């Protein structure tokens, strides 16, 4: 397999015991991601995260972030039609008094948003599949490498 790794930053954003996820679609398939996206050349991880949060959920100010709190490799299996390798660098955002009920997106790839209770994540198709980590993570926890996790 020969796939150049792509770096993706994202943020765990919790509000009233729930976590915000962005809905994406591929033909015949719906899946969810933490808000975030790709890092451009010459852009710091935190700058990329702030840019992506503005695009995907409309938070235009410099949201305070913790982390990174986790790193995940998503490497497509050898038998996959297209080689793919994404390195996910996950931060956590401090929303302060902001509400996530009126989230808006400027990104055409985002088909919607939803707040999920941490106990509801098991039935969600999440890329990468980090439901267990999200349900256990607490602010101040040490950063962890979650290994190679792939969700087709």
List where the protein language model places each region:
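Nudix hydrolase/Nudix homology domain
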Residues: 29-32, 105-152
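Intrinsically disordered, low-complexity sequence elements enriched in Ser/Thr/Gly/Pro
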Residues: 4-6, 12, 21, 82, ...
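Unchanged
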Residues: 39-64, 72-126
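N-terminal strand-loop-strand
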Residues: 1-34, 46, 61, 95
């Amino acid at each position: 397999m020969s796939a150049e790794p792509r770096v993706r930053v994202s943020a765990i954003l919790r509000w009233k015991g729930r976590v915000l996820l962005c809905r994406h679609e591929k033909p015949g398939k719906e899946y969810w991601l933490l808000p975030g996206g790709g890092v451009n050349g010459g852009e710091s991880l935190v700058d990329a995260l702030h840019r992506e949060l503005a695009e995907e959920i409309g938070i235009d100010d410099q949201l305070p972030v913790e982390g990174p709190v986790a790193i995940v490799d998503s490497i497509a299996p050898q038998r996959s039609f297209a080689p793919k390798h994404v390195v996910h660098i996950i931060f956590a955002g401090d929303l302060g008094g902001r509400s996530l009920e009126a989230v808006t997106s400027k990104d055409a790839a985002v088909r919607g948003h939803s707040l999920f209770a941490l106990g509801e994540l098991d039935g969600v198709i999440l890329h990468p599949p980090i439901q267990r980590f999200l349900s256990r993570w607490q602010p101040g926890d040490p950063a962890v490498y979650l290994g190679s996790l792939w969700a087709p």
